[in-house]
């Protein structure tokens, strides 16, 4: 299907709304905490993708999984870290702190690709990295002075998200340089599965109410499974046309 300009704009608005809903939903949870929040969201992501993938790519998708590719497993591990760290961070500190910390993702990606792939960075990128570092340092210093006991640990957990995302992008670039076309949507399924298995024992005994499970089910289906499927499909098309630094 070819998107018209108007439909493409509304699609972007929709997927942005889906991604931004996690902070709001987390603040409306009644009893679910920390690792249990992550477990239920990841669990419903797995269930959703088990339905979405065959509908989207056909039933043969399961026979095409690159189980022998190390990049597939590393990619799944990165998604697992991102899924787990994001929700745990939201339960530890303010949503704004988490999102600001995650905003360093593109700059971390630039640094990692420079170190491991040898990509050259223009002077403006180095300047942006320095300014971002100063800004984040100033933010951390001002927040620590307020005496919030969870701010530092919450921010450190949130920092795992852009780090894992940067490693993820570097893996994609590396796999492409070796002639492998890594499909990231099955990697999302693997990441959600790993996240569920990791957080399940840490979630016991379950405390989430039916209301909480319903909200986290919405996150798993719409914020992760649906949003990521759309975004990664767009990214795959865009990679054929341009390179992103």
Where do the model's predicted regions map?
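Hydrophobic transmembrane alpha-helices of multi-pass small-molecule transport proteins
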Residues: 49, 73, 121-143, 192-196
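Loop-to-transmembrane-helix transition segments
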Residues: 7-15, 61-85, 153-161, 200, ...
């Amino acid at each position: 299907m070819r998107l018209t300009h108007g439909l493409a704009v509304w699609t972007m608005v929709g997927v942005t709304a889906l991604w931004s809903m996690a902070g709001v939903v987390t603040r409306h949870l009644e009893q679910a905490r920390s690792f249990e929040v992550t477990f239920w969201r990841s669990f419903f992501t797995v269930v959703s993708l088990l339905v979405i993938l065959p509908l989207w790519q056909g039933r043969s998708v399961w026979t095409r999984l690159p189980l022998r590719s190390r990049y597939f497993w590393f990619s799944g591990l990165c998604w697992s870290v991102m899924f787990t760290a994001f929700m745990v961070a939201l339960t530890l500190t303010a949503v704004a702190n988490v999102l600001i910390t995650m905003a360093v993702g593109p700059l971390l990606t630039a640094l990692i690709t420079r170190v491991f792939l040898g990509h050259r960075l223009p002077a403006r990128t180095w300047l942006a990295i320095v300014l971002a570092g100063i800004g984040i340092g100033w933010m951390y210093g001002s927040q620590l002075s307020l005496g919030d006991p969870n701010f530092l640990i919450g921010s450190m957990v949130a920092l795992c998200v852009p780090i894992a995302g940067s490693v993820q992008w570097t893996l994609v670039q590396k796999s492409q340089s070796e002639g492998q076309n890594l499909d990231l949507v099955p990697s999302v399924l693997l990441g959600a599965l790993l996240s569920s298995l990791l957080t399940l024992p840490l979630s016991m005994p379950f405390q989430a109410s039916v209301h909480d499970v319903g909200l986290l089910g919405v996150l798993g289906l719409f914020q992760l499974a649906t949003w990521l499927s759309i975004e990664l499909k767009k990214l795959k098309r865009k990679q054929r046309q341009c390179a992103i630094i």
